[in-house]
């Protein structure tokens, strides 16, 4: 209802007015336990060091994840739900689920691209092989709690940097999901939307301001939040992320403009995560569902 309200009320005299605001997004980050890397004799493969050297490609990351796996216990957990691994891999492959034409509310489903299919397959292979924990059905906090306890060396897609950095008893490392060529991903799916309330007395003035602000990303002062709890390396990483966001490199995946976990879409994704349907079949099944949902916002 809120999303529908936003797109309807964001219209004035035939023109659509929307704005977005971002925070210091950490969902593209990978947190890792340097102590466990050392225990596995993998401290020579420090992820952030490799990233700064331009050597951490997605395939290199996957190789390290596999090398950290002993055939019994997974090396990696994914924050909140395992599907977030598929999402991050889609960004690493250079695509997304839903895109938007800048300055408008015209959305397109891009989940049917070859890039997303290949990304989902790579992510699902890691789940199926046991390299990554399939925590479907667990509490949304399970992965971050297990990582914080020191039970797994790698946490992908963490939105809990502040809590983990404040409370972990191990040497914490961080990097960003790399794309296939080794460039750090800078893409999010959680943005703030706003619309003009119907009873505003000066809607034209509000619309003018919002129209000027549309498609801008506002950075926040993250330094006071993190500078006393993270290492200099992690702080440098946050600085780099902030600079890229402000420079206009931040991309947005708009799949949250619809509820992908309803109307059958989520059920298909859950079948894929459980391994009962292939990524290609899942994507084929949900592509038209997503397109149909997006039509309600035209």
Q: Model regions: which residues?
A:
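Glycine-centered hinge/linker elements that transmit conformational signals in sensory
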Residues: 61-67, 100-137
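Extracytoplasmic/periplasmic substrate-recognition and gating elements
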Residues: 11, 166-227
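Short, solvent-exposed loop/beta-turn-alpha elements that line the ligand-binding surface or hinge
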Residues: 1, 51-53, 96-118, 179-187
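Extracytoplasmic/periplasmic solute-binding protein
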Residues: 7-30, 38, 54-108
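Paired acidic/hydrophobic, glycine-rich loop segments that form the ligand-binding mouth/hinge
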Residues: 153-158
